From Swiss-Prot:
Keyword Cytoplasm applies: yes
Segments for region (C): 553-624
Protein name: Chaperone protein HtpG
Known role: Molecular chaperone. Has ATPase activity.
Amino acid sequence: MKGQETRGFQSEVKQLLHLMIHSLYSNKEIFLRELISNASDAADKLRFRALSNPDLYEGDGELRVRVSFDKDKRTLTISDNGVGMTRDEVIDHLGTIAKSGTKSFLESLGSDQAKDSQLIGQFGVGFYSAFIVADKVTVRTRAAGEKPENGVFWESAGEGEYTVADITKEDRGTEITLHLREGEDEFLDDWRVRSIISKYSDHIALPVEIEKREEKDGETVISWEKINKAQALWTRNKSEITDEEYKEFYKHIAHDFNEPLTWSHNRVEGKQEYTSLLYIPSQAPWDMWNRDHKHGLKLYVQRVFIMDDAEQFMPNYLRFVRGLIDSSDLPLNVSREILQDSTVTRNLRNALTKRVLQMLEKLAKDDAEKYQTFWQQFGLVLKEGPAEDFANQEAIAKLLRFASTHTDSSAQTVSLEDYVSRMKEGQEKIYYITADSYAAAKSSPHLELLRKKGIEVLLLSDRIDEWMMNYLTEFDGKPFQSVSKVDESLEKLADEVDESAKEAEKALTPFIDRVKALLGERVKDVRLTHRLTDTPAIVSTDADEMSTQMAKLFAAAGQKVPEVKYIFELNPDHVLVKRAADTEDEAKFSEWVELLLDQALLAERGTLEDPNLFIRRMNQLLVS
């Protein structure tokens, strides 16, 4: 062989191989699914390239996958006549993993085999799964359009290195030979191999053929028998497709070992003709938060594969959706640039978005437990929706789930429809609070009066919540109201006090004036409040002021944060406020007021500019 060289695997490949062989062994038959799936992708790529260059077929347009085995040599071979690979492509695809974030992903794997198995399955092991059952793998390949002498040989024992060389290969495509480990004889059994192929490959449009050997007149005659249906699953009638076939097809296109939560298969005719098959995964992909990674549907035009990750058909907040769209209205030579500005694309995107939202709404109604699984995995992504998609804001809002004072649990299970159904008579607004954590939201002094009156408050503690609530302003005609902002409806609740209490408050006017004089421009205003029951003081913001949580988001993003000026509200019935009001010594009065303000700021922000000063004041007042 010419040009032979031995190269070392990229370190991530070595790590993946080691983890995969140990954690996927209990489900080892999936190697055949992965290799046939890769062969199917190679055929799709050839069909696409041949649209503009039919010569790539080299007179052989009948694409297929073939599986054969040799019991004497203990080898299993999977071959295709798809697009094939050049030497550089072999090194890129079989010696490295060109996925961003791979290193950190692999570092997240530990000793929990069941968990590792799921994660590696999500990652998409593809070709490397061959090493689960083989102690040596040999690849012979030639790219479509290349001369026979430009074939490539690749071989490895799956340890630290591999060999690559130039060979002559007459036929186009890729041939992978697995030299099976001891104890893997089941994959040399004709019936066993047939059953695996039937299980995993019935939905693939490409014929999968198995070698048949028969003795005739003293000679061995070789023929090939097709053992899958070889019809693209989405082109079949829904009534003919079993749930098991839908699930296997999902695993094929999503490279995910886990079953999907739900799916929707639709054929639309009329002004626009298309077929869509959309899946909701049961687990978030490992790279969902990687901004560089492309997310999207597989695009087919008139059943011809065009591209993976066509992100133009799904809004970003639904980037977890997997599946495909097969359109009859787009040209076969469509490019990403054409898709970007196409009216057809926009119409399809709108229709598919509505389809997914309807699918999720149905899941929420039919199976609350499954929907909760979805929410735990993808809720944070869906919360991007109200800001991104005003047209579907109401539909998205119905799908949101929150923690609330009604359940007093950190689990986000309360829908807005649930909340509205429990609103008190005369209640016109949906009350919520945002905080750094569920515990901080639940124990916020802003809730005291509302809890006392039995009014439910939504407890929001995800980082995205404050940003989301800037766009989600109402639901079912009822406006949202942050309980940490000054509002007339909250004041009405607080003003339900008797006349004697109001007279007592007038006597505290000089006290309020003293506090204002002491704090000056540090606060926007000082006032008495009846919103509190157990807490001496709180700080709140005006309706037009930036909230505390939004200021924190600005700071975390490295942006300049406008100064937040708080309204300092004091509880006239609290013993500490009465103590401060009765203090004539100005120095001690100052200590009391500063301590009350620091307490209120700490409850609101979770931090103080000078915590040491706060501790000193606290200690001084404790010993005085």
